[in-house]
Regions:
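Metal-dependent phosphoesterases centered on the DNase I-like endonuclease/exonuclease/phosphatase
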Residues: 27-115, 119
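Short, structured patches in soluble enzyme cores that scaffold and shape functional sites
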Residues: 8-11, 48
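Conserved small/polar residues in nucleotide/adenosyl-binding loops
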Residues: 1-5
Length: 155
C-alpha cells in the first residue's frame, strides 16, 4: 500500500480580461474539496502549473500585474485558502526569501531579462513537511515557457 498520493494538475487560466475568473474560482473550490477527500485516506502531494503567483515575491512586476490573470486578488486569496486548509508550498517552506521564477512569457525577451512568474509548485500535506529534503526550480533548463520543478522527499 502506498503512503502518499501524487496528483498532477493544470489549474485553468483566468485568461485575458479575466473572462474565466468566475469559472476558475469554482474550479479552485472543487479541486480543494477533491484534495481534502483524498487526504482522508493518506497524505497528498500535488504539483503542476497552478497559474498563480502567490505573493509579490513570486512575480517580477507585481504592481503592473495586479489585474492580470495569475495575480488577481481573488486568485491569490484562493491560494491562501489552500494553505489555510493544510497544504504547504514546499519551495517557499525551504526558501522563504528566494526570488526565482518558473514561467516567462515568450514576448519581450522575458526569460533573458528574468521577468518571470513562479506558477509551478509542489504542494504537500502538512504531515509530509518533515519528509521534505529539498525543493528546486530548474531555471537552467530551457525548451518551454515553464521550467521544471522538483521535490526531493526522504523515504
Amino acid at each position: 500500500m502506498y503512503k502518499r498520493q501524487v496528483v498532477t494538475v493544470y489549474t485553468p487560466n483566468s485568461q485575458d480580461e479575466l473572462k474565466r475568473l468566475a469559472y476558475r474560482m469554482e474550479w479552485e473550490d472543487a479541486f480543494l474539496s477533491y484534495l481534502k477527500g483524498l487526504e482522508q485516506e493518506k497524505p497528498v502531494i500535488f504539483c503542476g502549473d497552478l497559474n498563480v503567483a502567490a505573493t509579490e515575491m513570486d512575480i517580477k512586476n507585481a504592481k503592473a500585474n495586479e489585474k492580470n490573470a495569475g495575480f488577481t486578488k481573488e486568485e491569490r486569496e484562493k491560494f491562501a485558502v489552500i494553505k489555510e486548509k493544510g497544504f504547504v508550498d514546499s519551495f517557499r517552506m525551504l526558501y522563504p526569501d528566494t526570488v526565482t521564477y518558473s514561467w516567462w512569457s515568450y514576448r519581450f525577451q522575458a526569460r533573458q531579462r528574468n521577468a518571470g512568474w513562479r506558477l509551478d509548485y509542489f504542494m504537500i500535506s502538512e504531515s509530509l513537511k518533515d519528509a521534505v529534503a529539498d525543493a528546486k526550480i530548474h531555471t537552467e533548463i530551457l525548451g518551454s515557457d515553464h521550467c521544471p520543478v522538483e521535490l526531493d522527499l526522504e523515504v
